[in-house]
Amino acid sequence: MSGISAQTYDIVERRNSWNAGANVTGIMMENTNASYAELYGSNNQGDFRNSYEASKTWSAGATAKSITHLKDYSLIGSFSFDHTSGKDMSGSMFIHPGFYPVDILEFTPGRKDLQTYSFMGGIATNLNPNWRLGGKIDFASANYSKRKDVRHTNYRLDLQVAPGIMYHSGELAIGLSYIFGKNSESVKAEVIGTAESLYNAFLDKGLMYGAYETWNGSGIHLSESGISGFPIKELSHGGALQFQWKGFYGDIEYTHSSGSAGERETIWFKFPTDRITSHISYRFRQGSNEHFIRFNLQWSHLVNNENVLSKETVNGVTNTHIHGSNRIFEKEVFTANPEYELMSRRGELRLGTYLSTFKQLTTQMYPYVASQKMFCSRTYVSGVLHTGKLDLKAAVSFSTGNSSEKNRTAETNTEPGNPPYRLTDYYNLQNEYATASQATFNLGLRYNFNRGIYAEVQGSYTHGFNLRYIEGSSRWNETIKFCLLYTSDAA
């Protein structure tokens, strides 16, 4: 088929199970060319939100994506830009709160702006009738700013490079890929006003235990001599194996990352992480209908070690010495996502659930130990009905969870000091947001013009139940899109 298709670009991507993994040579397992461009704007409002989110935000951006198959090679690429702005924001100073094992919180509400740029490019080629070679790069950069004391400016970079190779014969395909990743973020804070000592910050070292003091105090690490802000980074290496036989596809990926906070000799934290990801799917046809059964798994284990540092100044030169380290935090996450999807000429149906368990342990001050277990689930159903030039969309999801915590004091022959400081209000709010029962309803309408141009409007409503710490129970979203889509079968 060539020309304009009712299927969206994400449908084209999901039809090929190899796109879930790291091996770009898998794009050659399908022969549909697709090009897509989108302009969008969205608005969010409501007080059912996390501690670092704004009650009102707006976003606008553009996205372009393409998959192209030529005679002996295939190309895939994308580019996107997004600008998001929110008022009266405080809490986490990081772009992706929770991504790293430490966090910095500030408490003065103000406007924050986030700009994100991303680029992805990949190429795969036939070496001979049975072997394929390819490579893919994903790059994203972001800057985040707040213009009210304590004001801060963040810069973040994410990079992943994944070369891969595939052997295929008939309906059998086996792939192998190497994965290199790097991410980094720098938080630079300052105060323009004169009341510098009145602004506090909190360094969260796990489960909201940490250091609470003035923003430029030595325990926060935002204003240390010789160091530009609070730099943090991760470097990872890994590999992946892919296998396909007829309609069955499976892969497994493993990466090990070395993370650190600080720079040069002054490294405050080191946090190695092991991650395993697996995608399993089965695809079959019944007439003109296609059915997909998927099962995705993710597991990660992280430990965070805080270095014991001292500084010595000799002849005007300050040197930092590391005297050892203490393991202050440990986290294990497991997520399972079974899913079923039906694709037909009349529409699509998709349903599934996310089941996640979290185990966290903090031991940042001997002999005090705190551990937490959390379970979260989200079940979702979505559908699209094609009726001439109109596509009707609907989705509903329900989330719930629970958590428990245990605190104990290890045996010691000495008198223990005061327990570590805890930001209890924020801890309770974030726990409730993660585990509260909530339902989300989404409706959308898409109108298809000629030549692949279409416009789409969407609206969603989220309601939280039985809340104690979150300010409100409702959250609304409205989105409008203008898009261009073209698909065709490769020659």
Model-derived regions: residue spans:
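Outer-membrane beta-barrel proteins
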Residues: 45-59, 110-112, 142-156, 228-230, ...
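N-terminal, post-signal peptide beta-strand-biased segments of exported outer-membrane/organellar beta-barrel
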Residues: 1-87, 100
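Outer membrane beta-barrel transmembrane domains
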Residues: 96-106, 204-343, 348-485
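Outer-membrane beta-barrel translocator/channel fold
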Residues: 82-115, 177, 184-187
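Conserved small/polar residues in nucleotide/adenosyl-binding loops
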Residues: 486-491
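Surface-exposed extracellular loop regions of Gram-negative outer-membrane beta-barrel proteins
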Residues: 124-148, 156-162, 251-266, 350-358
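Short loop/turn motifs that connect adjacent beta-strands in outer-membrane beta-barrel proteins
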Residues: 24-35, 66-76, 126-133, 168-175, ...
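A surface-exposed, glycine/aromatic-enriched loop/edge motif typical of exported proteins
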Residues: 182-208
